[in-house]
Curated annotation (Swiss-Prot):
<feature type="binding site">
    <location>
        <position position="111"/>
    </location>
    <ligand>
        <name>substrate</name>
    </ligand>
</feature>
<comment type="subunit">
    <text>Homodimer.</text>
</comment>
<dbReference type="InterPro" id="IPR020095">
    <property type="entry name" value="PsdUridine_synth_TruA_C"/>
</dbReference>
<dbReference type="InterPro" id="IPR020097">
    <property type="entry name" value="PsdUridine_synth_TruA_a/b_dom"/>
</dbReference>
<dbReference type="InterPro" id="IPR020103">
    <property type="entry name" value="PsdUridine_synth_cat_dom_sf"/>
</dbReference>
<dbReference type="InterPro" id="IPR001406">
    <property type="entry name" value="PsdUridine_synth_TruA"/>
</dbReference>
<dbReference type="Pfam" id="PF01416">
    <property type="entry name" value="PseudoU_synth_1"/>
</dbReference>
<protein>
    <recommendedName>
        <fullName>tRNA pseudouridine synthase A</fullName>
        <ecNumber>5.4.99.12</ecNumber>
    </recommendedName>
</protein>
<dbReference type="GO" id="GO:0003723">
    <property type="term" value="F:RNA binding"/>
</dbReference>
<dbReference type="GO" id="GO:0160147">
    <property type="term" value="F:tRNA pseudouridine(38-40) synthase activity"/>
</dbReference>
<dbReference type="InterPro" id="IPR020094">
    <property type="entry name" value="TruA/RsuA/RluB/E/F_N"/>
</dbReference>
<keyword id="KW-0413">Isomerase</keyword>
<feature type="active site" description="Nucleophile">
    <location>
        <position position="52"/>
    </location>
</feature>
<keyword id="KW-0819">tRNA processing</keyword>
<comment type="function">
    <text>Formation of pseudouridine at positions 38, 39 and 40 in the anticodon stem and loop of transfer RNAs.</text>
</comment>
<comment type="similarity">
    <text>Belongs to the tRNA pseudouridine synthase TruA family.</text>
</comment>
<dbReference type="GO" id="GO:0031119">
    <property type="term" value="P:tRNA pseudouridine synthesis"/>
</dbReference>
Length: 245
């Protein structure tokens, strides 16, 4: 068997997320069906992260096995040909060792969350960034973010449906960068809880609106209660950027 590692970009707007689900179209299903059409083999695609419906990806990584050798550039061309009705593109492919696993071999995952912060919405960024009309205090958000860095119990920021065995995660990066009309939040960790990034963003926005003081984020973290945190930020502002191995 030959194991292939692919890197994928997709627009999540009209997709039901990464994972295959009955009755809806997912990224996993689109790619598995595309692979079958050119290889004749039923494969299971393993992704490095299970993005929710509406979440986008710039560098999602996945792997699959085929019984025959195919040149990586031909795999890219073939997948993109059969996946072309959808906003899903493979932009890199390589043969890897058979012990490589897109999910379990990962050492770090990186996300970006985009906020358009101006009085009027952006047509160009519709369903690609969260529009917030009121000015956000980025300095206060940065101060609050510092409380979340490092190893913590992130129960307050996990979805009620989260299936992770432990709420303990290590946030290695949480940078907030302000442009003229856009705020980007950069988050990195070896792994994340379900909705963790979006719940962190939603809470930091409350700080940015001066509804919460920056120090309140520490209280939210220590509460270990989802009800203590802010709203879940919209899925469409989130981008899965990169996985490191």
């Amino acid at each position: 068997m030959y194991r292939y590692k692919i890197t994928i970009e997709y627009l999540g707007t009209n997709l039901a997320g990464w994972q295959r689900q009955a009755g809806v179209m997912s990224v996993q299903q689109i790619l598995e069906e595309a692979i079958y059409k050119f290889s004749g083999e039923q494969v299971i695609l393993f992704g490095s992260g299970r993005t929710d419906a509406g979440v986008h990806a710039i560098g999602q990584v996945a792997h699959f096995d085929l019984s025959k050798y195919l040149e990586p550039h031909k795999i890219i061309t073939a997948i993109n040909y059969f996946a072309r009705p959808y906003a899903v593109v493979v932009w890199h492919c390589a043969i890897v060792l058979n012990d490589f696993h897109a999910r379990f071999s990962a050492t770090s995952r990186h996300y970006i969350y985009r906020i358009i912060n101006r009085p009027y919405p952006s047509v160009i960024d519709l369903n690609r960034a969260w529009w917030i009309s009121s000015p956000l205090d980025v300095l206060a958000m940065q101060k609050a973010a510092a409380y979340l860095l490092g190893k913590h119990d992130f129960t307050s920021f996990r979805a009620s449906s989260c299936q992770s065995k432990s709420p303990i995660k290590t946030l290695t990066e949480l940078n907030i960068v302000k442009g003229d009309e856009e705020i980007k939040l950069y988050l990195s960790a070896p792994s994340f809880l379900h909705h963790m990034v979006r719940n962190i963003v939603g809470s930091l926005v409350l700080v940015g609106k001066n509804i919460w003081q920056a120090e309140h984020i520490k209280d939210v973290l220590e509460a270990k209660d989802r009800k203590a945190a802010g709203l879940t930020a919209p899925a469409y502002g989130l981008y899965f950027v990169k996985t490191e191995y």
